[in-house]
Amino acid sequence: MSYATKIHARYVYDSRGNPTVEVDFTTDKGLFRSIVPSGASTGVHEALELRDGDKSKWLGKGVLKAVANVNDIIAPALIKAKIDVVDQAKIDEFLLSLDGTPNKSKLGANAILGVSLAAANAAAAAQGIPLYKHIANISNAKKGKFVLPVPFQNVLNGGSHAGGALAFQEFMIAPTGVSTFSEALRIGSEVYHNLKSLTKKKYGQSAGNVGDEGGVAPDIKTPKEALDLIMDAIDKAGYKGKVGIAMDVASSEFYKDGKYDLDFKNPESDPSKWLSGPQLADLYEQLISEYPIVSIEDPFAEDDWDAWVHFFERVGDKIQIVGDDLTVTNPTRIKTAIEKKAANALLLKVNQIGTLTESIQAANDSYAAGWGVMVSHRSGETEDTFIADLSVGLRSGQIKTGAPARSERLAKLNQILRIEEELGSEAIYAGKDFQKASQL
């Protein structure tokens, strides 16, 4: 048995320059570390990220309370409990009972998750296996060759992530028409470089500047204009037919009075031009018919269930419809979405739920309903690569971790490259089967 002999938390900085929680978990095998990511938008149905709220330091975003909760409450209790690190479910159950609230608001999801993920790193080492193999074991993933995910790369930003009038938040490229992860990543990189030079040529030098997740953010007005630019980049790179396009609309951001305002960044926006759910669905259908769109995330607002259901009936057999704000990795919300037939894929963000065990449960519940699972980074990321191993261990077949730019994004993609090299012929690339990867 291997158990915690020392647990120590500190604050470090994320890719936005905000403090976040880092946990060192020590066992007889050494020291194992995890850093917690943070999202820009934090939904009402998410586990609570504990921030200090002291405006005189870090603009209120300090995490000293969460760090103290690890050092003063979790560490002594977990060390005393002497739980075998290999038993992730037992460790996470212990952390949940220590907190005792439904949304982890007592200790903070950022405190709990840091310990949960660091413990998983320790467990892999205790067994002398890579992290992704440990995750595959505890999630009861299908045996056989490991599946490497399609990298959904956010190459063009709009919405709340960017200036300009474009309402949709993310436009991603997904190199599905190739046979290896490394080839997919190379194609992604080449398309991205072509996109950057086209963007600068068309919109001026500063349009090549990158956003929080590495994508360009030119002053684009409409989704069509964005998609045309990406298609030009794919063509120019020479990969037409090999690269699909995905969008994260993040439509909750522009949902007002039951309508969708595609001009939401304009304070003088004309309410007579706002779209109803069915009208927005018409726009999506038009785009799907004109472009190689394989996946749309959050096409409607998180509580506009009717619009989701109506849209799923129309295109659910053609493309992947991903719930993020809709489901927030929350088992109850996922269950409702499955029952209502509102979507067919889950966006999995470990810090929305707060422990590894609950993240695995969310993925397995989704698989059981025939859904796909896309493992996702957050906009405030770090050099931590846990989600790369998570995506491989869960057989998710798809990962969303930004553009091939900025080290905190590349860290995950580079880790999957290493895993691909290590597995050799024991790995297959999800490719066009990304939505059904758990069954491959």
Curated annotation (Swiss-Prot):
PROSITE patterns: ENOLASE (PS00164). Pathway: Carbohydrate degradation; glycolysis; pyruvate from D-glyceraldehyde 3-phosphate: step 4/5. Its cofactor is Mg(2+). The keyword Metal-binding applies. Pfam families: Enolase_C, Enolase_N. GO terms for cellular component: cell surface; cytosol; external side of plasma membrane; extracellular region; extracellular vesicle; fungal biofilm matrix; fungal-type cell wall; hyphal cell wall. Its main location: cytoplasm. The active site is at E213, K349. Mg(2+) binds at D248, E297, D324. SUPFAM superfamilies: Enolase C-terminal domain-like, Enolase N-terminal domain-like. It comes from the Eukaryota. CDD domains: enolase. Its EC number is 4.2.1.11. One of its GO terms (biological process) is filamentous growth. One of its GO terms (molecular function) is phosphopyruvate hydratase activity. Keywords: Cytoplasm, Glycolysis, Lyase, Magnesium, Metal-binding. Mg(2+) is required for catalysis and for stabilizing the dimer. It catalyses: (2R)-2-phosphoglycerate = phosphoenolpyruvate + H2O. It is found in: Cytoplasm. It is an enzyme of class 4 (lyase). Substrate binds at H161, E170, E297, D324, S376, H377, R378, S379, K400. Belongs to the enolase family. This is Enolase 1.
